[in-house]
A protein has these predicted regions:
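Nucleotide-sugar donor-binding/catalytic module of glycosyltransferases
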Residues: 1-100
Length: 100
């Protein structure tokens, strides 16, 4: 069974830890259909980091409206059949997206 999963990562001033989160998604044994980072008004270079180091990742930038707004913005942009949310300071084990 193939699942189309959109991964949504809200982020606010987390450029120092965001790579760990993104790398854990990219290392999934069952890859995500899309990865969306919603930058919630960061001033620490989050946008530049994602654009430079993660060209496969969709980046959505908004004014700081909080994590719930960032998640909702990611949902609006997503195209997957399933949604998976990851906080920008967290990471997944490689089997997280495997259908069970």
């Amino acid at each position: 069974m193939t699942l189309s999963v959109s991964v949504i990562i809200p982020s606010f001033n987390r450029a120092s830890v965001l790579p760990r989160a993104l790398n854990s998604v990219l290392a999934q044994t069952h890859g995500a259909a899309e990865i969306i980072v919603v930058d919630d008004g960061s001033s620490d270079g989050t946008n530049a980091l994602v654009e430079r180091d993660y060209p496969r990742v969709q980046l959505l930038t908004q004014c700081n409206r909080g994590v719930s707004s960032a998640r909702n913005a990611g949902v609006s942009l997503s195209t997957g059949e399933w949604l998976a949310f990851l906080d920008s300071d967290d990471e997944w084990l490689p089997e997280k997206l495997n259908p069970k």
